[in-house]
Amino acid sequence: MGDIFKNNGVLQGRLRAVACAPHCFGPRLRCLHHDQGLTELAWGTWPHSHPVRHQPQMPSARECCSIVCMAAKEVSAPKAPGSPWMVPGDVAMSGHRVGALDERGHPNPQTGHCRGGSVSVTWSSVSCCRGRLAAVRVMIARDPSTCHLAKGCSPAWGFLPQARGPAGTRTPQRRCSSHEA
């Protein structure tokens, strides 16, 4: 919780597909920072490929690559807040976590920061990887030099397919089926 890294993956307009070159993925590629023993997941569209930290205890990036690609194609930008430096269509994909989900209505949403302001993060697509839930984070942003994303972890059981039901009750949880594992 609370691990913050600079988000350099801001893409103007429509989000481009993620490049899944085999040489860019795999658990043996060490994080250049060497601070938390993390591996790196390289993604982006040439010439804009950006590293994303990837926890070593999670499935390798190679195994989750198809999930990241699919989510990048399905993403749609939510409405931007009334801020002069953010407009609809400005989206940034910050990476994925396995078993860490958030939806609108979740009791512990993640937040992004742009130029001192705060903007909610929306999970744009949810899939499964090796039987565990996986999600791709999207935040509204424009300037990569002034936008950061707070990395958090929400347990898989906290995933809400929709907003909270009547009287704050939780809706049924989404589970990975055998063919999705």
From Swiss-Prot:
Where do the record's region annotations for Disordered lie? 162-181
Q: What is this protein's name?
A: Putative uncharacterized protein KIF25-AS1
Question: Corresponding gene?
Answer: KIF25-AS1
